[in-house]
Curated annotation (Swiss-Prot):
The keyword Signal does not apply. GO terms for cellular component: cytoplasm. It is found in: Cytoplasm. This is DNA replication and repair protein RecF. SUPFAM superfamilies: P-loop containing nucleoside triphosphate hydrolases (SSF52540). It holds the Pfam family SMC_N. GO terms for molecular function: ATP binding; single-stranded DNA binding.
Amino acid sequence: MPLSRLIIQQFRNIKACDIALSPGFNFLIGPNGSGKTSVLEAIYLLGHGRSFKSALTGRVIQNECDQLFVHGRFLNSDQFELPIGINKQRDGTTEVKIGGQSGQKLAQLAQVLPLQLIHPEGFDLLTDGPKHRRAFIDWGVFHTEPAFYDAWGRFKRLNKQRNALLKSAKSYQELSYWDKEMARLAELISQWRADYVAQMQSKAEQLCQEFLPEFHIQLKYYRGWEKETPYQQILEENFERDQTLGYTVSGPNKADLRIKVNNTPVEDVLSRGQLKLMVCALRLAQGQHLTEKTGKQCVYLIDDFASELDSQRRKRLADCLKQTGAQVFVSSITENQISDMRDDSGRLFNVEQGVIEQG
């Protein structure tokens, strides 16, 4: 469902804005520091309950204000508007409303508004630790497997309890009861993740090949422990090692999506521009898989579109985004940088010192 309207109040340097949006492309044009990234950040907050730039709520609330508001309206397939909103206060209090109903959960926001973010710091998906790639996989599983969210939450709680017990346990028998349920959840979570990667892998590799035809891209899922060994057996066999270290070494919390280019780690081969294109390909593949499985469309947020990309690569990405038919928000310093994306259905907004006006 595309956003038809966006209202932002007291968010960073945006005191207040109320804008009607295109179901296709929406361009935010302005100099650095003008507030265009803050618009993307506010939309991200609306879909995730947090900023992608700061974990501290106080930093995104406007100075001398006690709270912020972000509200949106969506058009569903029947052209009915669904209102959603989030209110955050400096003391950490968060209120979520969906369809006018208060007390909703952040996970429900994420279900209503599936977002894909492409921004200058997004290389961490490819170059940093496994947690970023686990989050990438889990975004897809969350949106396609209804039971995943609760199962993953239960596993993490059990893992935390197990780590606490490791410090005092005198034998493995003291952990065996907890490990049975933990192993059941681990096998379930791992299978969901493996199925998801298998389903979207060909699309991801195809898009990577289109964006980077000079390279052979390989994706491989690692579940976090030895492939052929049941997880409960791993827990029992590794008890002494886990106890020495003070935490559970193996498990779905160690899973990874291993990505190689010509059998070499991506960071050793690709330039920054090529890394950005690969991130774009992976995000687009996820969005297309979501649409195929659920009928939902992603909303794409692209911050600093021209960064790291020459004109040919910008055009390639623009063409691919157009083909999705999804709603896209793009920030750019100049109109010239987004010329390949412009059409009659898109809307352009000029952003200056936190003021957003339709161009």
